[in-house]
Amino acid sequence: MAIRRIEGLLHLASEGRYAILVGRFNSFVVEHLLEGAIDTLKRHGVSEDNITVAYAPGAWELPIVAKKLAASDKFDAIIALGAVIRGSTPHFDFVAGECAKGLGVVALESSLPVINGVLTTDSIEQAIERSGTKAGNKGSEAALTAIEMVNLLKAI
């Protein structure tokens, strides 16, 4: 008996419906993440009709909007994008931690892929690097993960 292998395939992207959830805070970074995510979805065959972009004020609000999007049954995956940049107070730790935790809870409770594309960086420079310059575009990477997860869950 052969071992069965289950994987999500990137070439089946056109079959999915994707919500991109964007935290507007630090928009100078997040806009590039959004561009990267949309470009990646489209390059993998996703029609613009199957992409919805929703905006929240910031990373703190992403989990509750993700929960509402998941409950709508209109999407196969949610891609959460945002940028939390460390400052001189502990606010960063609370926002980054609760955002990640909340997105994870939504994914588990809804059985829907909720991809965490929220940058958590120590500096503005790091955030800029991860939004399309030296360190690639994490929005694009999040979109690839969403495509793979949609197809993986369909294959199970």
Swiss-Prot record:
Enzyme class, first EC level, given as a word: transferase
TM region(s), chain numbering: none
Record: residues binding 5-amino-6-(D-ribitylamino)uracil: F25, A59, W60, E61, A83, V84, I85, N116
Enzyme nomenclature, EC number: 2.5.1.78
Residues noted as binding (2S)-2-hydroxy-3-oxobutyl phosphate in the record, renumbered to the chain: S88, T89, R130
Annotated keywords: Riboflavin biosynthesis, Transferase
A single BP term in Gene Ontology: riboflavin biosynthetic process
SUPFAM superfamilies: Lumazine synthase
GO cellular component annotations of the record: cytosol; riboflavin synthase complex
Pathway: Cofactor biosynthesis; riboflavin biosynthesis; riboflavin from 2-hydroxy-3-oxobutyl phosphate and 5-amino-6-(D-ribitylamino)uracil: step 1/2
MF terms in GO: 6,7-dimethyl-8-ribityllumazine synthase activity
Entry annotation: catalytic residues: H91 (proton donor)
Record field: catalytic activity: (2S)-2-hydroxy-3-oxobutyl phosphate + 5-amino-6-(D-ribitylamino)uracil = 6,7-dimethyl-8-(1-D-ribityl)lumazine + phosphate + 2 H2O + H(+)
Pfam families: DMRL_synthase
Subunit structure: Forms an icosahedral capsid composed of 60 subunits, arranged as a dodecamer of pentamers.
Family the entry assigns: Belongs to the DMRL synthase family.
Known role: Catalyzes the formation of 6,7-dimethyl-8-ribityllumazine by condensation of 5-amino-6-(D-ribitylamino)uracil with 3,4-dihydroxy-2-butanone 4-phosphate. This is the penultimate step in the biosynthesis of riboflavin.
Protein name stated in the entry: 6,7-dimethyl-8-ribityllumazine synthase
Gene source species: Acinetobacter baylyi (strain ATCC 33305 / BD413 / ADP1)
Gene behind this protein: ribH
